[in-house]
Amino acid sequence: ATSPRELGRKSLAVNLSDVAAMGAAPVASFLSLSLPPGVTGVWIDAFLAGYHALSTQFGVPLLGGDTTSARDRLTVSVTAIGRAENTHLKRRGDAKPGDRIFVTGYLGDSAQGLQDMLSGRDTPFIALHNKPEPFVNEGIWLGGRNEVHAMMDISDGIASDLLHILQMSGVGAEVSLDMIPTNTPIELAVAGGEDYKLLLTADVGAAARLAEDYKAKFGEPLYEIGRIVAGEEIRWLDRGNPVLIECEGFAHF
């Protein structure tokens, strides 16, 4: 199960990830809790300790919020405020044909962790599900690179999230399944969600240099997984051969 401390940390992490995915620096957050009967002071203290640990790590103060009682269900609502130069903001609708597609880390770990947790298995993937690490400094740095065109974080699975970029940019994509970094079945890597890695497109002429500079700066690779093409859909390839992927990311209601 997810501990209250992990839940507190994760509730802020996913919001910092949203801010970083636009190339912005998070500067503050607001937290609202709706608490059902049975939630103890010990639980609340642990939740806030997890939240505070991450806010301290990235220097993002909690400036306020609200606490109310609920009839039967816990609700956590976080708002993160970010700041960026206008020229550094990265949006979903700016991908261009020829762009190379990158992700900043392994995909599928969180979905595997959720499966393992629900089935009672004790594996290292569970910690990756409960404690996602937002790419805050990486997002800020990528925001300052003009060759990065479109960017977002992967919260719903790359099959779903890449489609958002394509639809808003009016383009298509070719993605090589064999190039996707993963330790899990490819279905989880493609559609699992809650990975909170950054997904970005970069100008083809500067993509190799971008990857080199990123590796030099952060000590981790940018993983190239495909390219933007004309069209309006994702073509999935496996070692150059077209394949059919039937899976959906998380669908918001």
Predicted regions and their residues:
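Glycine-rich anion/phosphate-binding loops
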Residues: 1-14, 38-49
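Residue-level signal for inorganic ion chemistry
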Residues: 15, 23, 62, 98, ...
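Glycine-rich anion-binding loops of enzyme active sites
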Residues: 25-115, 227
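Active-site-proximal betaalpha loop/short-helix elements
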Residues: 38, 112, 130-194, 238
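Short, conserved charged micro-motifs
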Residues: 41-42, 89, 205-213
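Short hydrophobic/aromatic beta-strand micro-patches
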Residues: 81, 199-203
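Short, compositionally biased
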Residues: 112-128
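Acidic, Ser/Thr/Pro-rich beta/coil linker or hinge segments at domain junctions
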Residues: 130-133, 211-253
